[in-house]
Amino acid sequence: MTDRIVPATLVFREDGTVVSPLYGDIYHSAAGALAQADHVFIRGNDLPERWRHKRTFTIVETGFGTGCNFLATWAAWRADPSHCERLHFVSVEKHPFARDDLRRAAAHIVAYTTIEPLVDALANAWPALTPGVHRLEFDEGRVTLTLAFGDALDVLPNLALRADAFYLDGFAPSKNADLWSPAIFKSLAKLADEHATFATYTSSGAVKRALDEAGFAYRKVEGFAGKRAMLVGEFAPRWRVRRHEPPRALDVGTRDAIVIGAGLAGCAAVERLAARGWHVTLIERRERIASEASGNPAGVFHPMIARDDNLAARLSRAGFLHALNRWRALEHAGHTFARSAHGLVQLATSADEFELMRESVDTLGVPSELARTLSRDDAQALLRTDIAHGGWLFPQGGSISPAALAAAQCAAAGDRLSRIAGVEVARLERGGDGRWLALDASGATIAQASVVIVANAADAARVAGLRHAPTQRVRGQLTLLPPGSAPAVPLPAIGDGYVVPLANGVTLTGATYEPDDADTTLREAGHRENLERLERLLPAFSAHALDAHALAGRVGFRCVASDRLPLVGELGDEAAAARDAAALTGARLRDVPRAAGLYGAFGYGSRGLVWAALGAELIAAQIEGEPWPLERELAEAIDPARFLIRALRRGRVA
């Protein structure tokens, strides 16, 4: 289980500097936080000169604190007309400030400067204080702040990125020795680009020894505000210090991509690539986007909570929070889509389950902005109908129109998107020039590009030619209830099934779960099952009061992997793995040969709304060589090659 986040306590000294009572040290020099950031970290890493005319530039910071280093760097990037196209700032923080405290601390530091407006932007975007990686975007996505909340000893080895510069800015080594330990510098060495630099205000002997042992060359330069010396330097290992190289951008001649499948997964990928300047061809076998499972009238979105905070729970939390950020960005850009705004309730199915739910929230220290426990009376008042048990309220959860969201994502791509509808891709082939060809059943080329993303659910593995990607097609039938026939709940509720109020007074409920059933027709038995489930969820509803045969509904099909997690990322090269099978029996995922330029985004099951945006961002980051938007452990849990590596270890690849 991941450790809960303990926020920092905001304390000001008489001279106005921010101090940590936990560590007994100041966050910045009394001579000025912004001046210190400029002298030590920006100039200490030869910025802005080193980021000029680059596509991306990545800075890694140990200790976010008040955010003044990020704010100063962002301001310097804005002021430089030759800045890199995309600036990535990745910062690790064990004790982040709560939003209001961060706003107060940062506003105090930058008062009466041109940086003041940036503080509001940062504070407004500040995430819930939950463990893990949080990605925030500013200046239309050209500046990205990736926050990693947790102990640096645990977090740094779990990051996937290639760093161009390091800001080493923890509290003094005498106050917080862990952040200056050899283990920290070894982790940084595994992230460093071959030309990476670093800067730090300290010049202690222990830090110099740890830097040297990790492969960093250092030199003393004049310190800040009368301090005699500080350290700067570069990554210059005299021996091999890492087994695997940090991720690089995909080497392509032309920045164009094919996305197969115009559902939630595919349209999210289109938007993320187009935002980075890629030209994308979207191929959909139907005439319209979101015609399969993504065409449901509404879908619910919420994170999972598990007492042990397992992989699925962490992934759903990361996906949920990332999706909210992406949707807000779309709305801010003027793209509209219907989504509810008053939260979502998850109801327990028994008194024992309610106690487990309550204990889970308390044990994990879940922030109230993410979820909070509701008593039976509170839940009943919120839903305005009788219920049997309490549960959770997800204040930011709710329902959304998947088709409208997909349309907004395509609209955001603008003229970087080309669509091919009513055409089915039968297979993929790599041309002699290394580009991918999408072929129809006759072998004719539909489109070609440097990159292909298969996002067509249960057909993805077949189109990509994968043998080791076990997915299952699961039929789901939902039911539409006419106005006045069900309790008029004001917000979505889930538990044993779900109920969603639609704008026209119709109530949506469902859905059945029928593996390996390809029937596309509505069935009375399916409606009856949904009605009985709704009766258990909302006892005031009578399943027998309606004629199930006369009800409207819809049938869709989920794509579910054997381990119930999605398949997202670069696909394995199964042919190459078969040739080297004997050497790969003890391999790790990073050792598996990959089909360069071929990616997957499928197997989302019933959680496409929660996982699609994060999956698209992960693929875009992998293609561009950017910091990944989630921990490596989580990325490996959804890596499409995980099934291939399992087969290799069992000697089942030939």
UniProtKB/Swiss-Prot annotation:
Residues 260-654 are annotated as: FAD-dependent cmnm(5)s(2)U34 oxidoreductase. Catalyzes the last two steps in the biosynthesis of 5-methylaminomethyl-2-thiouridine (mnm(5)s(2)U) at the wobble position (U34) in tRNA. Catalyzes the FAD-dependent demodification of cmnm(5)s(2)U34 to nm(5)s(2)U34, followed by the transfer of a methyl group from S-adenosyl-L-methionine to nm(5)s(2)U34, to form mnm(5)s(2)U34. Its cofactor is FAD. The gene is mnmC. GO terms for biological process: methylation; tRNA wobble base modification. Gene3D superfamilies: D-Amino Acid Oxidase, subunit A, domain 2, FAD/NAD(P)-binding domain, Vaccinia Virus protein VP39. This is tRNA 5-methylaminomethyl-2-thiouridine biosynthesis bifunctional protein MnmC. GO terms for molecular function: flavin adenine dinucleotide binding; oxidoreductase activity, acting on the CH-NH group of donors; tRNA (5-methylaminomethyl-2-thiouridylate)(34)-methyltransferase activity. One of its GO terms (cellular component) is cytoplasm. It catalyses: 5-aminomethyl-2-thiouridine(34) in tRNA + S-adenosyl-L-methionine = 5-methylaminomethyl-2-thiouridine(34) in tRNA + S-adenosyl-L-homocysteine + H(+). It holds the Pfam family DAO. In the N-terminal section; belongs to the methyltransferase superfamily. tRNA (mnm(5)s(2)U34)-methyltransferase family. In the C-terminal section; belongs to the DAO family. It is found in: Cytoplasm. Residues 1-236 are annotated as: tRNA (mnm(5)s(2)U34)-methyltransferase.
